[in-house]
């Protein structure tokens, strides 16, 4: 019996040093990427302060923690020639009485969040040159509630 155990021990010890490749141990699986938390009822991240869905032509104000505070409201973006950019942006500045120097157009209650792109009062039946048109009541609310540095997310 002792000889049998010694032979078995020699086989086990020698297997790792006899040039045979050790049995590979699978690496632990990478953890799946955490799902992006969305603001309920919107297609935008919970961290956004304003959300625009170009396909449904809606916009919302949120608290940046996943709760809608205003909306949905009608929101109309740009044309094919002048599309509204999608992505995540920061509010740059606000101008209640802005007049476009590019299109000589009044843009009341403008909240700029991308170069030459803003939320502002505008037609909900005529597309913009890339901005987000809101009705007057909604544009006043967006103007009052958004501040430079706030996050705006635009999805298509």
Set out the residue ranges of the language-model regions.
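Intrinsically disordered, low-complexity
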Residues: 2-90, 95-97, 154-156
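Exported/periplasmic cell-wall-interacting domains
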Residues: 34-49, 79-88, 93-156
């Amino acid at each position: 019996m002792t000889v049998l155990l010694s032979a078995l021990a020699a086989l086990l010890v020698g297997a790792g040093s006899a040039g045979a490749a050790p049995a590979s141990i699978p690496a632990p699986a990478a953890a799946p990427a955490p799902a992006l938390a969305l603001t309920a009822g919107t297609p935008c991240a919970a961290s956004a302060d304003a959300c625009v869905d170009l396909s449904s032509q809606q916009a919302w104000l949120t608290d940046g923690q996943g709760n809608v505070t205003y909306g949905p409201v009608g929101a109309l973006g740009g044309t094919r020639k002048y599309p509204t950019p999608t992505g995540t942006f920061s509010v740059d500045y606000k101008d209640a009485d802005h007049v476009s120097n590019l299109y000589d157009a009044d843009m009341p209650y403008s909240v700029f969040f991308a170069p030459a792109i803003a939320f502002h009062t505008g037609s909900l039946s005529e597309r913009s040159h890339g901005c987000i048109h809101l009705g007057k009541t909604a544009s006043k609310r967006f103007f009052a509630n958004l501040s430079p540095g706030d996050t705006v997310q635009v999805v298509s």
